[in-house]
Amino acid sequence: MISVIIPTFNEEENIAQCLVSLSHQSLPRSEYEIIVVDGGSKDATCEIAQKYADLVFTQTSKKVGGARNDGVMAAKGEIIATTDADCILPPHWLKKIAEDFLDPSVVQVYGPVYPIEEGIGNQFSLFLANMFSRIGYYSKTFFYTLGCNTAFRKNAFIRAGMYRCIDAGDDLEIAMRMKDTGAILFDNGLKVGFSMRRYEKFGAVQSIYEWIAIVSDGGESGKYSYSRKDYK
């Protein structure tokens, strides 16, 4: 079984389209579960999620990494897939993940993203992000495993120490520990629709700058707005 984990916080405007896309996967519904881990939403996020998800509960650990960790510990599946509440998953997303893990040496897979919103600027921003992912993977210097489009073996993830509860870079950091447990695979066909709302609100350059600054400082945000929960 594959367990899909989605952290949420005040996502009533986005969570339905994400969960609908997950409900229309080519993988049989009996072969995966949907887990929504909420960060204390004040809107109708949980009510909407309960219409589609197998399990909805409030996180007890801190930050997005902690929410994913909580989801992993509640998961029934031996394979864990993670995405974000504002993403759209193509119909064959879970089937691709299942196929990638037929190789017993693989402990984690990840793939590229494409913008949900239109615009040349959005396309260019994610072109650069995907290029960054490929450079890291093929050079074997780092693995830019975005939390919106990655999957891993539960046992290997737990052995690696799980996500750090930091503001940014937890998905990049965990991969450096996961590689010590087995092979990490970048699958060009494992694509996810990614919302550009953060970039459109704060600006692409500012968002990227803040992400780099936070990661360089060990993952703690402090003065930066990049990882705050109160943006819509």
Predicted feature residues:
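Conserved donor NDP-sugar-binding/catalytic core segment of glycosyltransferases
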Residues: 92-121
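Glycine-rich, basic loop-to-helix element that forms the pyrophosphate-binding segment
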Residues: 59-75
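Cell-envelope/extracellular polymer assembly enzymes that use nucleotide-activated donors
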Residues: 1-3, 33, 173
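Acidic donor-binding loop at a coil-to-helix junction in glycosyltransferase catalytic cores
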Residues: 167-174
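Short, well-formed alpha-helical segments that are part of the catalytic scaffolds
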Residues: 11-25
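A conserved acidic beta->alpha catalytic loop
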Residues: 21, 38-46, 87
